[in-house]
Structures are given as C-alpha cells and as structure tokens.
C-alpha cells in the first residue's frame, strides 16, 4: 500500500494547484497500487481545501480511487512513537502528519510513503 501525503492529495483535489498535473501523472503511474491515507493527512488536506467544493472533490477522490483509511492506534504508545520520531528528526522541522506517516510505515513494512 502507498500512503498518500498531504501535498499530492491537495494537488489532486485542486486543479489550480501548481502540482495538479504532476499529481495526476503520478496517479496514473500508481494505478495498480493500493492507496491509503491517515487521519493526520486528511486534517491537513481539509485545512488547505477550505472551500466546500474542494472538500467535495476530496471526498470524490477518496471514493473514486478507493483510498483506504489507514487506522492509527489511539494509544499513548503510538503518540509516544510519533513524538520520539519528531524529536529525532527535529532539525528537519517535521509536523504531526509526517511523524504519523513515518511511524505507520515503520510499523508495517508493506506500507510506503
């Protein structure tokens, strides 16, 4: 499964985005792959896609591409792992979604970002 990060997801949903065409091209290259998204990425995408029509497009993209919801553990262990990862890579200034993607893909080697 390929985990989708915020930038390509937003680009798929907003034709005005500078990376829209690149995202469409990359999506075609990944047509045979299973795609997934975590809650933190959806939260960031909704922040960037503030208009109702953009969020409707987000919902359509999730549905049409059958993008799986990648569950995250709601336990302190998961949060601690993410916080530890954020601390380890603090010089790169990662955000919570970056940490979630890193920890999820680290827990399951079948997941790629």
Residue ranges and their predicted role:
Residues 1-37, 49-63:
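Short, well-structured N-terminal submotif of metal-dependent ribonuclease cores
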Residues 6, 39, 96-99:
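Conserved glycosyltransferase catalytic-site signature
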Residues 9, 26, 48-49, 85, ...:
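Short alpha-helical scaffold segments that flank and stabilize functional sites
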Residues 9, 42-43, 55, 76-79, ...:
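Alpha-helix N-cap/helix-start and coil->helix boundary motif
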Residues 10, 43-46, 66, 83:
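Amphipathic alpha-helical segments within well-ordered protein domains
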Residues 31-32, 64-74:
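Short, mixed-charge aromatic SLiMs
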Residues 71-113:
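Active-site neighborhoods of divalent-metal-dependent phosphate/nucleic-acid chemistry enzymes
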């Amino acid at each position: 499964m390929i985990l989708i990060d915020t930038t390509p997801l937003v680009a798929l949903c907003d034709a005005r985005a500078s990376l829209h065409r690149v995202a469409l091209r990359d999506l075609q290259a990944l047509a045979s792959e299973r795609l997934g998204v975590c809650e933190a990425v959806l939260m960031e995408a909704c922040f960037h896609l503030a208009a109702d029509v953009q969020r409707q497009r987000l919902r359509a993209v999730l549905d049409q591409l059958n993008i799986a919801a990648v569950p995250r553990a709601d336990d302190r262990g998961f949060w601690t792992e993410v916080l530890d990862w954020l601390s380890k890579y603090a010089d790169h200034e990662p955000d919570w979604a970056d940490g979630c993607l890193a920890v999820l893909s680290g827990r399951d080697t079948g997941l790629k970002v």
